Amino acid sequence: MAVKTYSAGVKEYRQTYWMPEYTPLDTDILACFKITPQAGVDREEAAAAVAAESSTGTWTTVWTDLLTDLDYYKGRAYAIEDVPGDDTCFYAFIAYPIDLFEEGSVVNVFTSLVGNVFGFKAVRALRLEDVRFPIAYVKTCGGPPHGIQVERDVMNKYGRPLLGCTIKPKLGLSAKNYGRAVYECLRGGLDFTKDDENVNSQPFMRWRQRFDFVMEAIQKSERETGERKGHYLNVTAPTPEEMYKRAEYAKEIGAPIIMHDYITGGFCANTGLANWCRDNGMLLHIHRAMHAVLDRNPHHGIHFRVLTKILRLSGGDHLHSGTVVGKLEGDREATLGWIDMMRDSFVKEDRSRGIFFDQDWGSMPGVFPVASGGIHVWHMPALVTIFGDDSVLQFGGGTLGHPWGNAAGAAANRVALEACVEARNKGVAIEKEGKTVLTEAAKNSPELKIAMETWKEIKFEFDTVDKLDVAHK
């Protein structure tokens, strides 16, 4: 066996980390980066630099390389592809041995894949487009506390999307008035109401008061309707200790579901909370506040499909996923891709939807995608078509903005939803025939009729900033 010797100095990254002959192992974590190199840096060197800086490399040769099996532990840039329609950047595919990462730690995965490498001078911009987590790593993660089927059983709701609403105005209401709004929405026909992402424990409404008034509203609406109801109580807090204190109180008063802002709250806190929810029989709703800071720039950051995968591993029963038709960013095909990534047990590579790798989730439960943001009754046919039954459709302004009040807004949405589901089940192409379906339903629902008149001119027709790259042929 040849004896390794140390040779000091700086050498090109490609000499160690560019390996086009490498065939990825089933146990490797695979990443696709979109790299925009600095002028004068060729593709192979840029790809190798990213592989090095996100795994074992540093800027110079170090003698301690001789104390480990560098060839085993290093990341390997094994393929490069053009980005269709954009010659300023390219895709680089990198394989990482599974032993580089702590088991069950999305924190550790992100620290490597999107850590210091994103400030590396050799690249002008860098975006993590997709990650393949091998089943060997998936099995080390807790995943959703309960998942879609368990939630349906807990809430006793089957055969349709779940219906929700974000209480508005999101800030400024007293706890008592907040609880009143919750009650009216639930009594009117919604399954859930929710805190908005920035409702924590402010001077105008402390968390414990909110929890108490909301629980009173839930219990009253359940008695009157005979249906299970819930409200996503946001337990996001300044410290993990305070977060768990709020979660424990929610459990104590009988709340079925709590909520966490998983990006601003942090992945460590989220994984811990998901584990707590699993142990304590609580459902967990996840808000994605701050995601667009990371995912909206098409050349730099982290694609939302990666944030979706990370959340499924970290744990959550719901995740906001965009609407396609509402006020928030979201290309239709890309959205369909990450919705499947949230719910399905196996997802095939499909470049037309931005999916770069097969992803096997094994027996890990799925996550409810949550459509929320600028939607109203006219969007219902498209939402039911796009998201299917295993989803949560949340109408904030589209409920509380009803001219007759919250209960009427909730009733309008419930009637619209059930009309669309019934028509779909009869074979009607509801996205195409939606106007007819809703108009017919409105004949027996004055609340729906008024809602349709109120929002008939409201559209959000802005071009998508982060478009899918043209599919490879």
UniProtKB/Swiss-Prot annotation:
It is an enzyme of class 4 (lyase). The active site is at 168 (proton acceptor), 287 (proton acceptor). Its EC number is 4.1.1.39. InterPro entries: RuBisCO (IPR033966), RuBisCo_large_chain_AS (IPR020878), RuBisCO_lsu_C (IPR000685), RuBisCO_lsu_C_sf (IPR036376), RuBisCO_lsu_fd_N (IPR017443), RuBisCO_lsu_N_sf (IPR036422), RuBisCO_lsuI (IPR020888). GO terms for biological process: reductive pentose-phosphate cycle. Mg(2+) binds at residues 194, 196-197. The record marks 327 as: Transition state stabilizer. Its cofactor is Mg(2+). Pfam families: RuBisCO_large, RuBisCO_large_N. Substrate binds at residues 116, 166, 170, 288, 320, 372. It catalyses: 2 (2R)-3-phosphoglycerate + 2 H(+) = D-ribulose 1,5-bisphosphate + CO2 + H2O; D-ribulose 1,5-bisphosphate + O2 = 2-phosphoglycolate + (2R)-3-phosphoglycerate + 2 H(+). Keywords: Calvin cycle, Carbon dioxide fixation, Lyase, Magnesium, Metal-binding, Monooxygenase, Oxidoreductase. The keyword Flavoprotein does not apply. Binds 1 Mg(2+) ion per subunit. The modification N6-carboxylysine is found at residue 194. NCBIfam families: PRK04208.1. RuBisCO catalyzes two reactions: the carboxylation of D-ribulose 1,5-bisphosphate, the primary event in carbon dioxide fixation, as well as the oxidative fragmentation of the pentose substrate. Both reactions occur simultaneously and in competition at the same active site. HAMAP family: RuBisCO_L_type1. PANTHER family: RIBULOSE BISPHOSPHATE CARBOXYLASE, RIBULOSE BISPHOSPHATE CARBOXYLASE LARGE CHAIN. Belongs to the RuBisCO large chain family. Type I subfamily. Heterohexadecamer of 8 large chains and 8 small chains. In R.sphaeroides the complex is approximately 500 kDa. This is Ribulose bisphosphate carboxylase large chain. The gene is cbbL.
